[in-house]
Amino acid sequence: MSKILLLIVKFYQYFISPLLGNNCRFHPSCSEYAKEAITIYGSTKGLWITFKRIIKCQPFCNGGYDNVPISIKNYKSLNKKI
């Protein structure tokens, strides 16, 4: 399931995002954030974290740097993958 979601995000990045322009108020962009969240947490929790991020990305938010939250447990498992 995660691979399918990552393909959807990549499709969005290459075909839809260029048409919309650079509108994300955060760094990394919401689509990059989604890729990281899905890679680290899997499809269910990654989608939930991404959903919360997209809700924050609106005109009344200042934006700024907002990285995917990484727990110590996930940090250790992420290092094993590398």
Swiss-Prot record:
It comes from the Bacteria. It is a peripheral membrane protein. It holds the Pfam family YidD. It is found in: Cell inner membrane. Transmembrane segments: none annotated. Keywords: Cell inner membrane, Cell membrane, Membrane. SMART domains: Haemolytic. InterPro entries: Membr_insert_effic_factor_YidD (IPR002696). Its main location: membrane. GO terms for cellular component: plasma membrane. Could be involved in insertion of integral membrane proteins into the membrane. Belongs to the UPF0161 family. This is Putative membrane protein insertion efficiency factor. It comes from Rickettsia akari (strain Hartford).
